[in-house]
C-alpha cells in the first residue's frame, strides 16, 4: 500500500465515480483537482496547440506550438513573442514536437528540438508533405532573444506509404530529455514500420523477400524506429550505450544506428521522464485498442511490440481485443483494423506467452520485462513528469504525473502514480492493481484507475514538468494553455 489507506481509497472511488454519469452531457469545463488543498491556475492561454515546454528561468519559458512550428517565449504569464518559426508538417502526429535544454544551457545556450520538416518550405498538413527522413533533431543556440540554428543532430523516418493502406503520419514520438548523465534521450515511434526493431525477425513477409523498410540499407533508417536513442550532445553514440559493441561488430549505417539505441520494441510514446531521486528513466507507451503501458526503462530494454503489449501473461487478452471485429475501425473503408497495419495483422499475435517471447528479436544484451503498470483497454496516456519539490506538500514529492493523449477520459485525465521505496515499481493503494494491470471495462474508461485520478478536464495533456518555483505545470494541447498546480491560497 502507498501513503493512503485502503479506507481512504474506498472514499476516493466514491468521490470520482459520482460525476461519471454526467460527463458526456456536461459542456467543456476548466481543469479541476480532487485534492481541495490544491488549485489550478492558468500560466498562459491563447496558444495554438502547445505541446511541450522548457523553463529558461523563473517565470520564463519556451513553449512549442505543434502545427504553427513556432517557439514562443512566455514571461510572467504573457506571450512575449516568437523566438523561432520552423516550416513544419503537422499532419496527424507530426509537427514541432519536443524540446530539451542542454545541461549547460546557461553557458552555451544550446536548445534541442524534435520536429517534422515540411517538404514544401512552408507549414503544411498533408500526409505526403514530408521527405522520407523528415523527422529530425536539431540544435539551436539561444542568444537571449531568439533561437538560431546551430547543427543537425539526427534524422528519422517520417514518410509512411505502404501498399494496400492509406498514407499515415502517426507514431513519430518526439519527446526529448537530457538525463542526469548529461546524455540526450529521444523517443522515436515505430512510424508504422514492421521489422526487427518491432520484433519481427524477418519482417512481415517472411524470409527471402528484400525490403529496405525492414532494417536497411540506407537511406531508409527503419532500424531507428520504435526506439529510445541515447546520444552525446553532438548526436554521436556514447560508448557505454547498451548495444555499442554490437553495433560496432555489425558495422555500416545499420551498426551505427544500433550503437545509438538505449531501448527498442516501442510502439509509440508521448511521455518520458527521469526520476529525480533514482535517476531511472520512465516512459509511457500507447497501445492500439489495448494495454497502454508505464515502463521503467533499463538500458537495453526490449519493450515487446509488436509481439506483446502489456504483461506477457496477458497476450491472449491482447490478441482477443485487437482481433475483435466490433472494435473501433478507423480505416474501415480500406478494409482493415487492429494494429494499424495490414502487413502484420493482429491475427498473427501469439496465443501463449511462451510463443510470444520466443518470437522476439533479441539484440545481444537486450532484455524484456513486463511494464510496471498497464491498462487492459486503451486510456491513451500522454505526457509524464515527476514533481521534484515539496511545493504541493510532502505527500506529492517525487510522484509521477501522467496526462492524457486524448480527452475522452474525464475530459482529459491527470493521473498521480506513486513509486515504491526503492523507486523500482509502482506503489498502489487499490488492491485490484496489485497485479500491475488496471482491468477497465472499455476504452477511455476509469475502472480500477479511480485511485490514480488526480485531476480532470485538462484536455490533451502533452507535457508535465516541475517549474523553477517548484509548482507542477501541465501543457494542454487541446485547450491552448499551460496550467500551473500549487497549494490553494
Predicted regions span which residues?
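Short, Gly/Ser/Thr-enriched beta-strand-loop segments that form substrate-interacting elements
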Residues: 452-457
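Sec/Tat signal peptide C-region and signal peptidase I cleavage site
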Residues: 22-28
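Beta-propeller domain segments
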Residues: 33-34, 94-96, 104, 117-119, ...
